[in-house]
Amino acid sequence: MVGLLGKKVGMSQLFDAEGQQIPVTVIEVGPCFVTAVRTKEKDGYVAAQLGFDVVKEKKLTKARLGGLRKANLAALNLLKEIRTEDVSNLSVGSELRADNFEVGEFVDVRGISIGKGFQGVVKRLNYKGGASKGHGSMFGRVPGSIGAQAGGRGCRKKVRKGKGLPGQMGNEKVCVKSLKVMKVDAENNLLVLKGSVPGFEGRYLVVCSALKGGKKNPWKVRGGKQESPKEAPSEASKVETPQEGTKTSS
């Protein structure tokens, strides 16, 4: 799995070859820097800790700033760990950009949704409410009965856990799955996804390869160690071996 940290820029629209309008979201992903590498032997799991968004040093705690200075990195405001299968080509200080994703693949986006304050059950939980036509309603938008309150034989005089009631709406962790990558701007570190993502403009996001139907691409690193490509066999090393049942010239 490949993942990057980013920030929501805003929404726009694209048009396909048939002229159909496609709503898209623009996300600034990277440049991200590897601040730590977790291995199975040392930490018990495999992951890469990434840092994003350079800010002034006075905005960070001394503990975080000391760890970043030890790794010779700038003051990064956001640090997140991303579970992955292989970290062999990652090292502390490696730079990751938007070209880790390809056009046409699917990604999952995690973030915090927009808070909408204290809301009732009709808006928060899609309750139907009372009738709005005819003779009107006796209870309108109130939740109605929430359980037995008489306390008689066989009745529990309490509200069951999980009962839908009015309360805080939004401002919670949300994961939007399988969004298609429409465009990748590696120079400006921009990723264009089909559809919407949680949060308002400027909200931090985590973009990872989709768990369902996503590609398992290797990490593309800039400024870190990379695996050397395998050399193609030379013409001299290609020796034809006779197959069984064929005659060789003497």
Where are these regions (language model features)?
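Extended basic (Lys/Arg/His-rich) segments that typically form rRNA-contacting surfaces
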Residues: 1-250
